[in-house]
Amino acid sequence: MSSDSMRNIRNFSIIAHVDHGKSTLADRIIQLCGGLQAREMEAQVLDSNPIERERGITIKAQSVSLPYTAKDGQVYHLNFIDTPGHVDFSYEVSRSLAACEGALLVVDAAQGVEAQSVANCYTAVEQGLEVVPVLNKIDLPTADVDRAKAEIEAVIGIDAEDAVAVSAKTGLNIDLVLEAIVHRIPPPAPRDTDKLQALIIDSWFDNYLGVVSLVRVMQGEIKPGSKILVMSTGRTHLVDKVGVFTPKRKELSALGAGEVGWINASIKDVHGAPVGDTLTLAADPAPHALPGFQEMQPRVFAGLFPVDAEDYPDLREALDKLRLNDAALRFEPESSEAMGFGFRCGFLGMLHMEIVQERLEREYNLNLISTAPTVVYEVLKTDGSVIPMDNPSKLPPLNNVEEIREPIIRANILTPPDYVGNIITLCEEKRGSQIGINYLGSQVQISYELPMAEVVLDFFDKLKSVSRGYASLDYHFLRFDPGPFVRVDTLINGDKVDALSIIVHRSYADRRGRELCEKMKDLIPRQMFDVAIQAAVGSQIISRSTVKAMRKNVLAKCYGGDVSRKKKLLEKQKEGKKRMKQVGRVEIPQEAFLAVLQMDK
């Protein structure tokens, strides 16, 4: 495609924190460009998944191609790529941004700048994108446009003098946003090679078509019938159809350089078209792939087990189907003495885990038990080998372990100055070490290195509660650090329950063991015999509590009489309980497995 035809293409993305009105702004842009008829419009057109709608978040990237007649009379092709806003999905954001030349930074004029938009904005600036600030929700009585502009300049460091002030809800000034896109965002630049290079922004599975990939053609063109090569896997596929979303799917005869659209090739699963990979022609391949591709690594692992063992094949099928759509989801079969057969699943973070579990339960009608999530530790064995460990019950015997290393993350927290003290106290409690504090206008940026294990469980909730909801968090993985870690096992009547094992810092082991025993004591129902709950590190018992037996009053029909008669009856009862304890099994309810999650609450 010549540089003339590329001159009127604008590829842009929207960067925003959760709830700052990104999807609503997208709706208005689609409406103004006539992408959908008025009767077809609905709130958050692009959030197609019901969970995305309910939670008010965007999970998968989506795209729309719209024609726009500008005020100078020219028709421009706007390709808008919608990105997820949550920290778990930051890799998908970086891929969406790599496909654009510019980005709209949407900031809620009432709330100001938040951490997630800062992180994504830095990614955009690093990739050389033109960032256009947009202040949304100016119809709110609490909106303060000047303060929001000052914050953008202080926190992010880009000029916000000519930021566009809009209200996506009422549609005020949306035309100014479109003019800013056309005049301030540059067209795609011609590349040095004429061979096909296309970046995969996202892939999803369609029941009728197989895998549909959202791509940005950097150079060359893709037509139905051409044979393409996926550069990271080395596999070739035949292209069946290509087209764009308007947001409805529309077929075209070809996708040219600078355009964003979908392709449908004979790919069977999403792993055949990984996000961030490069497509090229098999007959005439490009000399090198586009930069920035990386395998998605799960950071949080948990066991998922069906409540009813007969649902195991259905769970496998449901996970297989979900994995077609979700390249970051990993799973492998696992069996647990306490829970039966299930799967060990890997997720990007806690939100990702919740969404997967919710989709399994809702879309596939499964009733699931999940074990406590753990992060991936590195174990250095005495023979010098290093193994990753995502399941505490699989920890090798301690005499074979040289050291255990935990993942450390760098957390950037943005907060109003009033809550700095509370947040520092929270980070110190979580074994954090402070990197720095910067005062930026009306916000404070606090940087900490924290153990990931402390962050994945409930750090986000606690951060919101100590800052009354004002603080926001962004984090990324740094490295593995060695430390004195031990595994705390839970024994019920002397039997180890593998699903309740946790790995903790040695200094916390006693306290966590005690808390776990107390919590379990409240959750395990009383039996006809005493149930001993113990927490152990290795062979050493560190805590114990007992669920007392239910007992019948065997002395009820003894009036006065001989004490030896009473003794005999009590001894007989005791003997019976003892025999019962030898054969009795304790059923552990689902709540008990979640007790590990709610330990600090």
Curated annotation (Swiss-Prot):
Q: Which residues form a coiled coil?
A: none
Chain positions recorded as GTP binding sites: 19-24, 136-139
**All residue ranges annotated as the tr-type G domain in the record:** 7-189
Example GO molecular function term?
Answer: guanosine tetraphosphate binding
Instruction: Set out the biological process GO terms recorded for this chain's protein.
Output: positive regulation of translation
Recorded E.C. number(s)?
3.6.5.n1
Per UniProt, subcellular location reads as:
Cell inner membrane
Query: What is the topology of this protein in the membrane according to its UniProt annotation?
Result: Peripheral membrane protein
List the catalytic activities from the record: GTP + H2O = GDP + phosphate + H(+)
What does the UniProt keyword field contain?
A: Cell inner membrane, Cell membrane, GTP-binding, Hydrolase, Membrane, Nucleotide-binding, Protein biosynthesis
Cellular component annotations (GO), alphabetically ordered: plasma membrane
One Pfam family matching this protein: GTP_EFTU
In the UniProt record, does the keyword Cell membrane occur? yes
**NCBIfam families assigned:** lepA (TIGR01393), small_GTP (TIGR00231)
**Function, in words:** Required for accurate and efficient protein synthesis under certain stress conditions. May act as a fidelity factor of the translation reaction, by catalyzing a one-codon backward translocation of tRNAs on improperly translocated ribosomes. Back-translocation proceeds from a post-translocation (POST) complex to a pre-translocation (PRE) complex, thus giving elongation factor G a second chance to translocate the tRNAs correctly. Binds to ribosomes in a GTP-dependent manner.
Alphabetized HAMAP family for the sequence: LepA (MF_00071)
Family per similarity comment: Belongs to the TRAFAC class translation factor GTPase superfamily. Classic translation factor GTPase family. LepA subfamily.
Q: What is this protein called?
A: Elongation factor 4
Q: Which organism does this sequence originate in?
A: Xanthomonas oryzae pv. oryzae (strain KACC10331 / KXO85)
